[in-house]
Amino acid sequence: TNDSIVDSLFRKAGIVCCHNRQELTTVCAIFMHPEVKGKNVAVITHAGGPAVMLTDVLSNGGMDVPHIEGPKADELLAKLFPGSSVGNPIDFLATGTAEQLGYIIDACENDFDNIDCMCVIFGSPGLFPNWEVYELLNEKMKTCKKPIFPILPSIINVKDEINDFINNKGRINFPEECIFGNALCKI
């Protein structure tokens, strides 16, 4: 039988077909988060390249990364450093702060009805420790109704912060945006 036929039958039955262990563990980790109720994703980042790659994977996999605009988007942009973008992906630059990430998450949660979940890519630009950012991310994940998926790629240079996020806060990290994106599209 053709794999696409089997995948279609499984999808109709609510079964997610995975083709390797990495895909399986990533899909399982996504299931550990609140259910995504739609196909509209906000990609939030301080690193443009990974956001573009994730956006491409999501779009190619059937998810939408809708453009964000209007007065609420303008209000959010005014709270970010010059050069930032809120069009989606939302890029608040390598110098972006935990406070600014909080503004972005709050806007996606409360102001942008065309967003169903958030993917936050936050590594380490090497400018400052990430403790405050990961603490804020943990708190927002507790309070937001829309799922937030942390993509924390800097597993070497901020390993202590990521270990705390995983081991002490009980969170899951998706260290690679494209693997995460492909898994999210399967669900």
Language model features: what each stretch is:
Residues K37-D116, V120-G123:
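Short glycine-cluster motifs
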Residues T1-P66, E135-I187:
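Peripheral docking tails and interdomain loops at the edges
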Residues K12, P89-F92, P125, N168:
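Conserved short-loop catalytic and cofactor-binding motifs
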Residues T25, L101-I105, Y134:
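Short, well-ordered alpha-helical scaffold segments within catalytic/effector domains
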Residues G126-V133:
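Glycine/threonine-rich flexible loop motifs
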Residues G123-P125, P150:
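Short, glycine/charged-rich beta-strand-loop motifs at protein surfaces that mediate ligand recognition
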